[in-house]
């Protein structure tokens, strides 16, 4: 469950997260343990998905860690330099670990983000499907 919400928060932009938070219960106060700070990470790849690993290149990542007043710690790593996104994601990660807050935050923030991501993926798949070539059909047309 945590892996899912951390992934959704990492892929959403700060404006979208903030808009969803406007409809959610107020987040608890927090203090920053680390960052937000931006750095580089080496990305690795594998030829064909299962070949020998190689260094593909570096990418920019922003990370943040926060602690809520009840002691719960939240973390976030996001691609790019958006410090606001990293901090919002870390605070939400910490808040979502509380079983009392989780249902309201899932309904107000995480589920709408998941639905938007699923719709975006479906649109992209439909767009790609429109350009698909059926080689069997081409062979029978000759």
State what each model feature region is.
Residues 1-25:
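Charge-rich, low-complexity N-terminal segments
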Residues 2, 10, 96-142:
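Cysteine/selenocysteine-centered motifs that mediate thiol-based redox chemistry or coordinate metal-sulfur cofactors
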Residues 12, 57, 62-65, 74-76, ...:
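Small-side-chain structural scaffolding
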Residues 17, 39-41, 50-51, 69, ...:
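Residues in flexible loops and secondary-structure boundaries
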Residues 18-20, 28-29, 121-123:
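Intrinsically disordered, low-complexity boundary segments flanking structured domains
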Residues 23-70, 75-79:
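Structured beta-strand/loop patches that form or line metal/cofactor-binding pockets in enzymes
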Residues 47, 59-61, 83, 118, ...:
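Short capping/connector residues at structural and topological boundaries
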Residues 70-111:
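A hydrophobic, small-residue-rich beta->alpha segment in the mid-to-C-terminal subdomain
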């Amino acid at each position: 469950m945590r892996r899912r919400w951390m992934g959704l928060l990492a892929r959403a932009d700060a404006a979208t997260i903030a808009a969803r938070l406007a409809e959610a219960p107020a987040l608890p106060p927090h203090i920053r343990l680390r960052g937000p700070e931006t750095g580089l990470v080496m990305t690795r790849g594998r030829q064909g998905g299962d070949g020998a690993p190689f260094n593909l290149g570096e990418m920019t990542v922003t990370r943040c860690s926060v602690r809520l007043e009840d002691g719960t710690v939240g973390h976030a790593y996001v691609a790019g330099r958006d410090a606001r996104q990293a901090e919002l994601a870390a605070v939400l990660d910490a808040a979502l670990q509380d079983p009392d807050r989780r249902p309201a935050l899932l309904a107000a923030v995480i589920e709408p983000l998941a639905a938007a991501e699923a719709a975006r993926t479906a649109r992209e798949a439909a767009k790609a499907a429109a350009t698909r070539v059926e080689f069997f059909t081409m062979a029978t047309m000759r």
